[in-house]
Amino acid sequence: MKSSTRTKIGQKVRKIRSKNAGPFWLTLDIFCVDVENFNYIHNQLKTNKVANLFQIHESKIKRFDIPDLNVIKLSFPRPRIQGKANDTDMHGASYAALLEELEIN
């Protein structure tokens, strides 16, 4: 029986950063170590898993794979408009920590 080892994406990349992309959108940047690492993450990171993690529909996620920079960008609508009374993450910084915990093969 083949065992599958799962690891967290944050352990496999140089850095994951999340930030506002205006008051209505968030962007996550995944900085890979090199081209080999980029190709691995590109193949392992499924957009539907990210959608499930953040509890949004997959069609709402805009994904940009940028091999020349070894970067993957994910953008999606904020769950709340930035600065509204119920906004608990004004700068969108907590999303990186959540994505770092996502398990991949």
Write out the residue ranges for each language-model feature.
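Long, contiguous binding/interaction regions
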Residues: K2-N105
